[in-house]
């Protein structure tokens, strides 16, 4: 069986084959007229120089052929509103108004499992993987335009273009809340993030300052990321910063 032998029109291909065969698979998808691909396969930039060369070739083929792909090295995507589950594990969250963007597939799946266990709805999930073509900021911009999305949860290991990310985040946070968890607070965590997806982790303090300037709510743990972002899907956007807090205790 081949992609070309499929009689129907195909909207999305999910690729899980070994990395060395991905370039040909993308060429087959382009020839078939498939516009989008979820590239779950690993063995690219995250493995070193040779994998980086292969990843660049895959991106060149996709861009030249007008094909958009997410990944590689991604767990996949979910759209409960579109009844789509294109991920590597059997997991089916309840529909909701929360969009989750995660640069870690394992953590993303854990957050969704928590959401299911706690009865929280998830409208969209996107594991970005190595972000060879589609970036976290692209997905953030997209979810910013979707009326079904009331809040966005963002797990970041690093970004390749801080200015572009800032511009996107500022535009989105004007209309809906964005909550972010940045990994790499310690030297060990920063090194682990870079080896996982090949991302540039950067200074934790720099990211914290960037989040503040962009209007992003920063949290410290994965459970906070889910709890805060899910709560915000049920709350109206504040009309001003004139908020007072009254407490019974002084501690």
Briefly describe each language-model feature range.
Residues 1-251:
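Catalytic-core regions of core metabolic enzymes
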């Amino acid at each position: 069986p081949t992609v070309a032998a499929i009689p129907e029109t195909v909207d999305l291909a999910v690729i899980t084959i070994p990395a060395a065969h991905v370039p040909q698979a993308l060429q087959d998808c382009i020839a078939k007229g498939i516009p989008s691909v979820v590239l779950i396969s690993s063995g690219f930039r995250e493995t070193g120089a040779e994998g980086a060369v292969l990843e660049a070739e895959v991106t060149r083929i996709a861009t030249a052929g007008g094909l958009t792909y997410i990944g590689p090295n991604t767990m996949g995507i979910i759209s409960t509103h579109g009844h789509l589950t294109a991920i590597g594990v059997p997991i089916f969250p309840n529909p909701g108004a929360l969009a989750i963007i995660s640069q870690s597939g394992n953590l993303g799946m854990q957050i969704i499992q928590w959401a299911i266990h706690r009865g929280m709805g998830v409208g969209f999930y996107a594991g970005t993987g190595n972000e060879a073509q589609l970036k976290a900021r692209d997905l953030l911009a997209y979810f910013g335009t979707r009326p079904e999305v009331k809040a966005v949860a963002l797990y970041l290991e690093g970004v390749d273009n801080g200015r572009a990310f800032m511009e996107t985040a500022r535009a989105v946070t004007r209309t809906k809340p964005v909550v972010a968890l940045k990994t790499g607070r310690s030297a060990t965590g920063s090194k682990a993030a870079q080896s996982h997806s090949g991302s540039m982790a950067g200074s934790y303090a720099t990211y914290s300052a960037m989040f503040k300037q962009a209007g992003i709510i920063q949290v410290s743990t994965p459970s906070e990321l889910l709890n805060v972002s899910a709560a915000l899907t049920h709350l109206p956007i504040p009309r001003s910063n004139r908020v007072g807090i009254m407490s019974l205790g002084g501690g």
